[in-house]
Design a protein with these regions (language model features):
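Generic low-complexity segments that are intrinsically disordered, proline-rich and/or Lys/Arg-biased
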Residues: 22, 58, 91-92
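GIY-YIG nuclease catalytic motif and its immediate N-terminal context
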Residues: 1-50, 63, 70-86, 103
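Cytochrome P450 catalytic domain signature, combining two hallmark sequence patches
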Residues: 54-60
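Coupling/hinge elements of helicase-like and P-loop NTPase modules
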Residues: 90-103
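Short arginine-rich
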Residues: 52, 86-93
Length: 103
């Protein structure tokens, strides 16, 4: 199942501050090739801004140019992240085959 809020936003600080809430949820980073990373956090806005400031661990897969997110409770977000990793198989999350066994 894709992101419930699938509207892709530009992966820039101004867009993150304007669009991403400081709330619990799951987020995805994308580029022209597709989804490159899916994460979960208790503060979507802060985590996305932190990704901008960190060295780019996704360099081999291309820099992120967009993001999307969906709100979810702390109890739901880890399961939702795993579900999305299995579905999208983003290269930044490593090999999703081990997660497929859990479903």
């Amino acid at each position: 199942m894709p992101f419930r809020n699938c509207f892709a936003r530009t992966f820039k600080a101004a867009a993150i501050r304007r669009e991403a809430p400081p709330s619990s949820g799951v987020y995805g980073l994308s580029n022209a090739r597709g989804w490159i990373y899916v994460g979960e956090t208790d503060d979507i806005q802060a985590r996305l801004l932190a990704h901008l400031e960190e060295p780019n661990p996704f360099a081999a897969h291309g820099a992120p140019t967009g993001f999307s997110f969906e709100l979810s409770s702390p109890g739901e977000r880890i399961a939702r992240q795993r579900q999305m990793i299995v579905e999208f198989d983003p290269p930044g999350n490593g090999d999703s085959r081990s997660m497929r066994k859990a479903f």
